[in-house]
Amino acid sequence: IEYQSMNRKQGFPAILEHRIQLSDRINGTLTRPPGASGDVPAMVIMHSSGGIIPNTWEWSKFFLDMGIATFVVDSFGPRGITTTTMDQSQLSYPASTVDALLALKLVAAQPGIDAKRIGVIGFSRGAAAAAASSFENIRAAVLGDSPLKFALHIPYYGGCSQVGTTTGAPLLYFVGKEDDFVSAELCTVTVGKMKERGANVADYVQYPNTYHSFDVENDKPRYYIANAQSWKKCILGQDMDDLSYFADGKKVNLQEYNDYYQRCMTRGATIASNFQAKTDSRAKTKAFVSKVFGL
């Protein structure tokens, strides 16, 4: 299903100042669980920096087997992007967030879908969208007067630097302690701040001896991408309520934040599957989704 979404270069100020340019046509694949009757819940699936991979469809099947429809968003293909691992500037993270929220609107309008039971799960870059779509002011700016909101948010190994007032929908976070794309330490701090703001954090799961993309099975159990962009060394913060920025513990303006963001970025990161973490996270995901959706 094709739909219009935000210009790939726009940022959060454009969203909150109602300057979104719906210039990018993207698409997603809606799959319903076989033999479904009545209105079923749905999960919007946001892919990683590698785009849609076999693991994306594995997750789709995982939810379909639970009797949940899935909508796999393709933020890359229609925009002519293959991967953003070496260059994340090809698509802004806010644009991915808008991709997710407009997918919610699209899926909610489909027959046979329960609009009150639509969740979002995202991986790496997609996790940033799964998390940012929980902020009430972002949701309201994108969806306008509509009361639509995601029923739950599941960010898998995404960067955690944003805090703010959420819609109240529960969040379930997963991260590997050894992740060298993003900082697990920063995630711990950020999730703590989210709780202070009243966020409904169902669980924050950090796996020891676990790297990025731990749920993805590859030809090699572990490999190093020398040219991958990493922000593990960055101490970043964004307050989404007033759109203030923090770098290295200090409050800064947007230009200073962007300068620091480029400066603290390093090259080289690890992808490693971890069967134990994958199995445990899937069990926790299943229990969480079942509880929220009342399955």
Task: Please give the residue ranges for each predicted region.
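Primarily recognizes the serine-hydrolase "nucleophile elbow" in alpha/beta-hydrolase
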Residues: 15-16, 92-168, 180-181, 185
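Short alpha-helix in the alpha/beta-hydrolase fold that links the catalytic acid
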Residues: 58-59, 169, 183-193, 219
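N-terminal cap/lid segment of alpha/beta-hydrolase-fold proteins
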Residues: 1-38
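Short beta-strand/loop motif that positions the catalytic acidic residue
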Residues: 173-175, 179
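Residue-level signal for short, function-critical loop segments
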Residues: 34, 48-49, 124, 159, ...
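Serine-hydrolase catalytic machinery in alpha/beta-hydrolase-like enzymes
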Residues: 15-26, 39-112, 226, 262-270
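C-terminal catalytic histidine-bearing segment of alpha/beta-hydrolase fold enzymes
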Residues: 201-295
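Flexible "cap/lid" loop of the alpha/beta hydrolase fold
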Residues: 84-87, 159-172, 220
